[in-house]
Design a protein with these regions (language model features):
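Short, well-ordered beta-strand elements
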Residues: 2-12, 32-35, 97-102
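Beta->alpha turn/N-cap motifs
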Residues: 14-15, 38-39, 50-62, 74, ...
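Ligand-binding cleft/hinge of the Venus flytrap
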Residues: 18-30, 108-127, 208-212
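A bilobed periplasmic-binding-protein/Venus flytrap-type ligand-binding module shared by bacterial periplasmic
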Residues: 22, 84-93, 98, 175-190
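Short helix-initiation/N-cap motifs at beta->coil->alpha
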Residues: 33-44, 121-139
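A conserved helix-loop-strand patch within extracytoplasmic ligand-binding domains
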Residues: 74-131, 160-162, 166-168
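Pocket-lining segment of extracytoplasmic ligand-binding domains
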Residues: 128-214
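Secondary-structure end/capping motifs
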Residues: 187-251, 255
């Protein structure tokens, strides 16, 4: 009897492209049904068992770490300026009273709270990622993903913070945006795990092809997107990334963003 395909969720931003390309081409042969969605939606779908494994925001892994195991060696990370996790404000940090946060984001909202000392009565509300509408009734906005590439010719009164760059400035550590989490009751064979790890390596060697086939950012020069994938995004959950992820876990616990501190556990 044929085993059902494991439902594998992956987000549809450019930074997932090097992982997504090999998975879409070869995933079915390895027992995966690949599904795309936003990072926040993937986290919710994995939690509700609508997915068996998914690339989810790192903060969402820590919220439910007892229910998940991670695929080793694979993540989406950055070390310094990344350009796709942007906090834009019309006021000084200590004067901000409300923030419109990209409704596709989870980890970036947590990161924002960790990096800045906001007023205790700060309001953060989720909005579709449209800067103009977000700033109508709010002092600041958080925008992630491909939409951030399109933010040009901003009003000079708007101050822009790259949250990955700010994290590195404050901590000196890699920031892990997303991890590959598998529900505890799901069996992933060694060949399937190795396939995911090899997909990362293969995809990183096909960046030009990823960019050429990507339709989400018309008008942005290919060399800009290639530089982003090759120089600003990292895909190895290596020692430095695990150190940064652990530090993020500790800070989230200290600030009450997560209720319990968990050790990182792998398959």
């Amino acid at each position: 009897m044929t085993q059902p395909l494991l439902r594998f969720g992956i987000h549809n931003f450019l930074n997932a492209g090097p992982l997504l390309l090999p998975l879409e081409e070869q995933g079915a042969n390895m027992g995966f049904q690949v599904m795309t969605d936003s990072p926040a939606a993937l986290a919710d779908r994995l939690k509700s068992s609508d997915l068996d494994l998914a690339i989810i925001p790192s903060v969402e892994y820590f919220k439910l770490a007892e229910s998940y195991r991670l695929v080793s060696d694979v993540c989406i990370a950055s070390r310094g300026e990344v350009g796709t996790v942007l906090f834009l404000t019309k006021k000084p940090i200590n004067k901000i009273s409300s923030i419109a946060a990209d409704n596709r984001s989870r980890t970036s909202v947590a990161l924002l709270k960790l990096l800045f000392s906001f007023n205790s009565d700060l309001s953060i509300r989720s909005f579709p990622p449209d800067l103009e509408s977000m700033l109508v009734d709010h002092s600041a906005a958080l925008i992630i993903g491909d939409v951030a590439f399109k933010l040009s010719e901003l009003d000079p009164s708007i101050t822009v913070y790259d949250l990955s760059e700010e994290w590195f400035r404050q901590t000196g550590k890699t920031f892990v945006h997303a991890v590959v989490a598998v529900r505890k009751n799901i069996f992933l064979s060694q060949s399937q795990k190795k396939f995911i790890q090899q997909a990362k390596i293969e995809g990183c060697g096909r960046v030009k092809e990823v960019v050429r086939g990507y339709r989400g950012l018309p008008g942005i020069e290919a060399k800009v997107l290639e530089n982003y994938l090759e120089k600003k995004i990292g895909y190895d959950l290596n020692e430095a990334a695990i150190d940064g992820l652990t530090h993020f876990n500790n800070l989230c616990y200290q600030q009450g963003i997560i209720s319990k501190k968990h050790a990182i556990k792998f398959l």
